[in-house]
Every structure is written in structure tokens, then in C-alpha cells.
Amino acid sequence: MTDHAGLVDYAEQVLDGKVALGSSAPRTAALLARCALEEWLDERSASWSSGGYPYPSTVSKLIALGALEGDELASRARRLWSALSRAVHHHAYELQPSITEVRHLVKQVPPLWR
């Protein structure tokens, strides 16, 4: 199992309640899924992003992914990364994402690398 697949599995365990995190479980699972997506993106971009300064941001890697591997994959990855980021960085005046919402996002991560 790759590291990013392990992160997704752990996110699913958090959402299933196998890891007791209480009310922070949805945000924690979203963070784990976003980390998995970013690890996958780091692997995909390793050939063209290594050794340079400054290290490319996730947004710039997502843009380059579209140019190098096609708009469909890149747009799916961009939308998913943005949605996971919103789930992780919600504001005090917003409702926390529900387990159902985060589970839907987590399930969309593995198809990116399959």
C-alpha cells in the first residue's frame, strides 16, 4: 500500500469512528485526504519540480498537471483539492462539514491515481 492510499484508509477509519476524535473527526479526515492528494501530486510532479527554488506550490502543480496530463484529470484534482481545503479551513461563522460530505470527498481521492 502506498503512503497516499494509507492516508485515505486512515481518513475512512476516522470517519467510521474507529479513531475517537469526537467532533473534529470530519475536519481531520478531510486533512488526511488532502495530504494524500498532495502526496500523489508530489509524486506526479517529481520529475519537473525537484531541485528548484522556490518549491512549487500545490496550486502551481495543479496548473502544470493540466498542461502535462490533460485538463480532465487536472480539473478533477483542482476541484477536489479546493473542496478538501474548504472543509479543513472552515470559519467560525460556518458550519463544520458533515461526515457525509467529507466521506463523499474522501471517496473521490483514490480514483485520481488509479
Regions inferred by a protein language model and the residue ranges of each:
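Generic structural signal for well-ordered, non-membrane alpha-helices
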Residues: A5-Q13, L31, C35-E39, S75-R86, ...
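Short, hydrophobic, well-ordered secondary-structure elements
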Residues: S23-S45
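Secondary-structure edge/capping motif, primarily at the C-terminal ends of alpha-helices
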Residues: V14-G22, E43, S47, A87-H91
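Alpha-helix boundary/N-cap detector
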Residues: T2, G6, T28, E72-S75, ...
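Charged alpha-helical initiation segments
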Residues: M1-S24
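Long, charged low-complexity segments
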Residues: W48-R114
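Short, mixed-charge, low-aromatic patches
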Residues: L15-V19, C35-W40, P56-A67
